[in-house]
Amino acid sequence: MALPIIIDCDPGHDDAIALVLALASPELEVKAITSSAGNQTPEKTLRNVLRMLTLLKRLDIPVAGGAVKPLMRELIIADNVHGESGLDGPALPEPSFAPQSGTAVELMAKTLRESAQPVTIVSTGPQTNVALLLNSHPELHTKIARIVIMGGAMALGNWTPAAEFNIYVDPEAAEIVFQSGIPVVMAGLDVTHKAQIHAADIERFRAIGNPISTIVAELLDFFMEYHKDEKWGFVGAPLHDPCTIAWLLKPEIFTTVERWVGVETQGKYTQGMTVVDYYFLTGNKPNATVMVDVDRQGFVDLLAERLQYYA
C-alpha cells in the first residue's frame, strides 16, 4: 500500500524538484499539497505549486494556501536564491486550476480526518502551517505518522552563522514541531550540503529527454548560479528539499542518528539555530531522527531513475 503523505512547501527550485520526485513515485500517495511563505511571498509560492502541478498534469491533488507570515515575526524571503518568481529559469505553464477556498490548515486537518491510516507530513519550507495545525487540532496528532522536515543544521547555518533559512524564518513554529511528541525526521544542512548536484548530473537529467527532465535541468541551471559563490566551497548545488522525499523512498542511502533537538528563539546571535544534543548532555529523550550523511551517487541515481517516469 502506498504511503499517504501531505506536502507543505514553499517552491523554490528544490521544493519543485521534491514535488517531481514525489509524484513520480508509486510508493507515495500525495493526498494534499499546501504552500508556505518562505522562498518567496505566499502568493508566489502558492502559484508555483499550481504551476508545477499543471506541468505534471496532477490537477487531481487538492491544494491550499497557507499562512501569509510566520507565527510571531515578519516574513523573510529568499528571492536572492530563487529569483523574482521563486522558480526562475524554465518556462513553466500558467496554473490551469485553482486552489481550494479553505486554508492550508483546514485542508491538512480534513485530509488527516479522512485518511484510513496515519499520514506522513513532509514540510520543505518554514514550519508555520504545521505548527498551526498542531496547535489548533490536538485531536489529530494521532493521525500523523511522522513529520519529515527540511530544516536546521547540527553545525553551520546558511542564512546566519547559526541558522538554516527555513528554521530562521519561523523558529517558534519549528520549536512547536520538534516538541510536539510526534516523530520528527530532520534533513538539515549536514546532509543536504552533501546531496549536491554537479554539472554532469544536470546534463544526465537533460539527456533523459522528456519534458519534465528538461525542466528539472533548467531549474538546476538557475539554482547552480547562486551556489557558485566561492564562500560555500561547493562543487555543485545542494538539493535540500528532495532529501525528505528520497529518505521516504530509500532510507538506506542516508545515515541518521536519534537525538534531542530544540530551536533557539531568543539568542542574540543564534535565533533559529537547531540545537542538537549530539552527545546526550541534556538528559532529554531523543525527539528526532537526524540525517547526517547521504550516498550522493545513490541520491542522484534515484532522481535520474524517477525522471524516467515522465517519458
From Swiss-Prot:
The active site is at H240. Signal peptide: none annotated. GO terms for biological process: nucleobase-containing small molecule interconversion; purine nucleoside catabolic process; pyrimidine nucleobase metabolic process. Belongs to the IUNH family. RihA subfamily. Transmembrane segments: none annotated. Its EC number is 3.2.-.-. It comes from the Bacteria. HAMAP family: Pyrim_hydro_RihA. This is Pyrimidine-specific ribonucleoside hydrolase RihA. The keyword Membrane does not apply. GO terms for molecular function: purine nucleosidase activity; uridine nucleosidase activity. PANTHER family: INOSINE-URIDINE PREFERRING NUCLEOSIDE HYDROLASE, URIDINE NUCLEOSIDASE. InterPro entries: I/U_nuclsd_hydro_CS, Inosine/uridine_hydrolase_dom, IUNH, Pyrim_hydro_RihA, Ribo_hydro-like.
